[in-house]
Amino acid sequence: MTRPFLFTSLPPSMNRFDRDGRNIGYDYQRRCIASWIDCGFDVCSINAPQEEIPQEFAKLVRVEKTERDASEIAGKPLPYLQDMIDVIVRVTAGSGGFALTNADILLSNETVDISESVRTLRPQECIVEPRMDFAVMDKISEGSLYPSGFDFFAFRAEDARSLSLNRFVFGRPWWDYALPLSACFQGWRRKRIESPFAFHMLHDERWDRKSWTKFGDCFLDEIVLPRAGRIPPDRFFVRYANEVAPQPLNSGFKTRTLKNILNILGFGSRQAMLGRLARLNASMLSRW
C-alpha cells in the first residue's frame, strides 16, 4: 500500500526548552519527524534555496527546494505557500491524498489511523484540524486545544491544483486561515477527525505585530474582499458565514458576525479589524 506524503518545511534549527531550561529543540524536531514516519507517512521538507536542514534529518526525509524565497516580505528565507503547493503537486504527480503540517507538530496514531484518513480522501474532501498544546514532553496527554488556528491539513493533490495563494508565506501569519478558507469557498467538504492526534510543545511566542498586520492585509485583499464585490457588508458576511458552515448558522452567531463586520471593513483601528477577522475565521471554520 502506498504511503501518503506529509509535507512540511523543516527549519535549520529549532529551540524548545524543558522544565530545567535546557534546549531540547533538536531532540524535539527528531521526535516530530519520527512521529510522522511512525504514523505511516513519507516525509518531504520543502525549503527555500539557501536553507539547509541538519544532515541527520535530511537522511530521514526527502528534501525539495523552491526556486525563490520570501525574504523580502518575511524577513527570512521562508518558502511561499503557493510555491510549496506547486512542489507538492509535482512530487505527488498530481494525484492522491497528502498532508501538510507545521514542523513542530507531533502526531499520534493511538486513537486514529491518520495516514489512512489522508490516503482515503475523496475528491474535494479535506482535513483541517487544530493542535493540542502541551508544556512538557512527559505530559503530552494533558494538552489543551489551541482555539485560534489550524496546524494540520490534508487534501488531494488534484484538488490542490486549483488553489491560488501567491501572497502567503509558510510560517508567517494568516496562511493557516487562507488555505482552508480557499478550499471551503471552492465547495470542498471537511472530513472531521474527532480524536486529537496533532500535538505541539508550547514555547515563547514570537508574535510580530507588523508581520501579522501585513499578511492580514493580504488576507483581506486575496480572500475576503474579492468575494464581497458590491454586496453590502451585512449581506456579504451572512453569506460568507453560511458558505463555511454545513448548516445555516444560528441567529445569535449571525448577529455577532454583523456586529463585527463594520469594523472589519473599515471602521475602527486596523489592528482591531484584523483581530476580529481572525476570531471570526476561527469560529466559522470550527463549524465547517
Regions found by a protein language model. Name each.
Residues 3-9, 36, 42-45:
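Hydrophobic targeting segments
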Residues 4-14, 25, 169-288:
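C-terminal catalytic/acceptor-binding lobe
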Residues 6-14, 48, 64-68, 104, ...:
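Short loop/turn segments at strand-loop or loop-helix junctions that form parts
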Residues 14-27, 71-76, 168-171:
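Short, flexible/disordered intra-domain loops and linkers
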Residues 16, 48-98:
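Active-site-proximal specificity loops/subdomain of glycosyltransferases
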Residues 26-42:
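Short, acidic, metal-binding catalytic loop of nucleotide-sugar glycosyltransferases
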Residues 95-108:
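Short beta-strand-to-loop acidic/aromatic patch adjacent to the donor-nucleotide binding site
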Residues 105-181:
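Conserved catalytic core of nucleotide-sugar-dependent glycosyltransferases
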